[in-house]
A protein has these predicted regions:
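Phosphate/pyrophosphate-binding loop motifs in nucleotide- or prenyl diphosphate-using proteins
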Residues: 1-190
Length: 190
C-alpha cells in the first residue's frame, strides 16, 4: 500500500513531474497529458458509480477504477529503464475480461437501429460522459505511443473500456426508460 505523508513536494513547481523510474517529464508533454487524461477518466467513472448506486447486477466499475490507476502507473513507467522489470502493466487477461463483460451485457440488448444520444437520465448521461472521457484518454495514449514505446495492452484496454461503457449505458437505458435515438436533421422536421 502506498503511504503519502506529505501531499506537496514543490518538485513540480518547475513544470515537471516525476515518473516511476525517477526521471522527470514536462507536465505539458504527451506522457503526462496521457496520464492526466486517464486520471480524468477515472474520476468520470467514479461519477458514474455514484449515479448507478441504486442499480444492481452491473459490472464492477470499482475494479475498473483500480485498473485505470494501474494504467496510469503503466504509462508513468517508461520502457527501457531499470524499473521495467517491476513495472505495473496492463495485461491481456484484463482486456479479455472487459470483452467478456461487453459480450454478456450486449447479449440481452436489442440491436442498434440508430445512433443514440448520450441522454435520457443522469445515470445514462454519466456513463456516456465517462465513455467520452475514456476516448479522450485513449487518443492521448495513442499520441504517446506515436512518440515513445508504450504497452499495447494499455491502448487496447482504453479502447475496450469505452466500448464497455457504451454498452453499459445501453443497459442502464434499457432499465431506465429507454434510449434517446438520434434524429437526423431531415427527419426532425426543423
Amino acid at each position: 500500500m502506498v503511504k503519502l505523508n506529505k501531499i506537496y513536494t514543490r518538485t513540480g513547481d518547475d513544470g515537471t513531474s516525476g515518473l516511476v523510474d525517477g526521471s522527470r517529464a514536462i507536465k505539458s508533454g504527451v506522457r503526462l497529458t496521457a496520464i492526466g487524461e486517464v486520471d480524468e477518466a477515472n474520476c468520470a467513472v467514479g461519477l458514474a458509480i455514484a449515479e448507478l448506486a441504486a442499480l444492481t447486477g452491473l459490472p464492477d466499475l470499482g475494479r475498473i477504477q483500480n485498473e485505470l490507476f494501474d494504467l496510469g502507473a503503466d504509462l508513468a513507467t517508461p520502457f527501457g529503464t531499470d524499473f521495467e522489470a517491476h513495472a505495473l502493466r496492463i495485461v491481456a487477461p484484463q482486456v479479455e475480461r472487459i470483452e467478456r463483460e461487453i459480450d454478456a451485457m450486449n447479449a440481452d440488448l436489442a440491436p442498434l437501429a440508430s445512433f443514440i444520444l448520450p441522454s435520457g437520465s443522469r445515470a445514462i448521461a454519466s456513463v456516456h460522459l465517462a465513455r467520452a472521457i475514456v476516448r479522450r484518454a485513449e487518443r492521448a495514449a495513442v499520441a504517446l505511443a506515436a512518440a515513445e514505446q508504450v504497452n499495447l495492452h494499455a491502448l487496447a484496454y482504453l479502447n475496450r473500456l469505452s466500448d464497455h461503457l457504451f454498452v453499459l449505458a445501453r443497459v442502464v437505458a434499457a432499465r431506465d426508460g429507454g434510449e434517446v435515438l438520434w434524429q437526423p436533421g431531415a427527419t426532425r422536421g426543423d
